[in-house]
Amino acid sequence: DNGSLRALHPLKARLLTESVLMKSLSQWVRNNGIISYDTLRTREELNSDQTPCVANFDFDVTAASYLNPLLRFSRAGEIRPGFFVCDMLLGCKLSLVHLQPFITKCRSINSLRNSPRCLFMFIADEYSEEAFLEMKRAGIIPATPEKLFGKDVADALFQLRDLVGSITLSLKDNIAAIDDIMSKLANIAGATNQLQGDLFEYIVAETVRIDSKDVEVGKICKSLKGET
């Protein structure tokens, strides 16, 4: 159980951080007119009909785009939009081994005869030089949270991942850390409401800590009957 818990916390932290990042990215591509507003889909869509998919390949984020370099025209003269597509993986420096599946996916789409033109992007904290250069050669944007959204947002995402990834609340001044995270991410549409729920257990834990020094979060508790 302890082994599963140790594996679960970093995964939960990464998925939560990437969820906030997807909201920020969605807001950014909409506000900058890169995509057709209502066509955006993310991997968090519960409706299977709205899965982010292009040419039968799944991505974390997709949206139709009417940017001129991405447009195509049918024989009848009808406009065929291109697509903005993005995958992301936070939490470590990515090597070419990590990114090769994404590169292959993008090249496969480009090789298909009737596939739409795409603007490909990958977001990670850091890339190896080999991975960065190979992404550029493949026509993919190797982005980072800091380059896209600035240092404050990138720092807040790191703080969030660090906080949620801790099995025990060993960090000092967690309430201040949570407040700092919320302040830095306040301008991302939907992020504040999401974090109020996701960080609720941490806020409660800090309150309980007043009377009890030994506090753990994220543990699955069971009754004597084995019920969770």
Task: Kindly give the residue locations of the regions a language model identified.
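Acidic-basic catalytic patches of nuclease active cores, encompassing PD-(D/E)XK
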Residues: G3-N68, D180-G226
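A generic secondary-structure micro-motif detector
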Residues: F120-F122, Q194
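Short N-terminal signal/transit or membrane-insertion segments
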Residues: N2-L15, L70-R75, L163-N174
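Conserved catalytic cores of phosphodiester-cleaving nucleases, focusing on short active-site segments
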Residues: S48-N110, V208, E227-T228
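Charged, structured surface patches that assemble and position nucleic-acid processing machinery
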Residues: E78-R117, A124-K184
